[in-house]
Amino acid sequence: MADEQQFIEDGLQRTQIDEFFAEELGRAGYGGMDVAKTPMGTQIVLKAEKPGMVIGKGGKNIRKITTELEDRFNLDDPQVDVQEVDEPDLNARIVADRLANALERGWYFRKAGHTTIDRIMESGALGAEIVLSGKVTGARSRVEKFNRGYVKHNGEPAEEIVDSGVGVAVMKLGTIGVRVKIIPPNAELPDDFEIYEDVDVEDYVADTDGESVEELLEGEPEDSETAEELDEDVAAGADDDSEADEEFVDEEIVEEDVEVPTDDDVEDVDVDELEEAVDEELDEDVEAEAEELMDEMDEEGDDE
């Protein structure tokens, strides 16, 4: 059988056993059960307001219940342990059954609801809620709620902290569902906090291997030493950065291939020869201009 199917079968069997106990032990104040399967058999812990009625005279009733569990639910060697409920008014299952019985006996629903929730709060509960749904007073179905204190309705606290119980009152006009939620007195809610006034902080300081605060402070370095170490670290980091920059520049110079002319490649040029060449070019230009002027003057003389 697959794990999912086995999980469903175990939950269904647990619900059927719970309904069986509720029918058989209703007058004894049945308050719930815990089932645990062990190698030695199935361990069942019953919670009841009147354990004597569950056990019976000479254990007759408990033997009958054990035989019924083996036959109806195929449990291997069931071992039933009965525990008495310390405070019945804080058990949601017992309170729901009591309220349902009161409604069946003819109590007015509002009186029964207020009386029940007042008893719950007087027992020390942090909060309680009672919901009656069905044909409470007339032919039409409706819902009536009674609240006291603080009750969580969702999240993990609603599943782990809040105690829930359900009962059914069979009336002439129809059934009335009874749902009860109770937060016990010792519940630790996630939003609880305490404020201490005029408290010495040293009383709440945790000891570290028996060492005092002064001994712990002696082992710590002074501020001046710490500052010097920081300066040394900064200087070392700056040197490392400069070396890294130099290496990077050298790599760039090596990568770039630049041709630089050397002294051997440059030809030796005589300055005097350059000056003579310039003078010769100037003399030739001057002579050419002089000849042009003489020709123009001769042409003007001939015209006259």
Curated annotation (Swiss-Prot):
Cross-referenced NCBIfam families: PRK04191.1, uS3_euk_arch
Positions of the KH type-2 domain: 17-86
Organism lineage: Archaea, Methanobacteriati, Methanobacteriota, Stenosarchaea group, Halobacteria
Chain intervals for the UniProt region annotation (Disordered): 216-304
One example GO MF annotation: structural constituent of ribosome
Assembly mode: Part of the 30S ribosomal subunit.
Protein name: Small ribosomal subunit protein uS3
Function: Binds the lower part of the 30S subunit head.
A single BP term in Gene Ontology: translation
Gene: rps3
Native source species: Haloarcula marismortui (strain ATCC 43049 / DSM 3752 / JCM 8966 / VKM B-1809) (Halobacterium marismortui)
PANTHER family: 30S/40S RIBOSOMAL PROTEIN S3, SMALL RIBOSOMAL SUBUNIT PROTEIN US3
InterPro entries xref list: KH_dom, KH_dom-like_a/b, KH_dom_type_2, KH_sf_prok-type, Ribosomal_S3_C_sf, Ribosomal_uS3_arc, Ribosomal_uS3_C, Ribosomal_uS3_CS
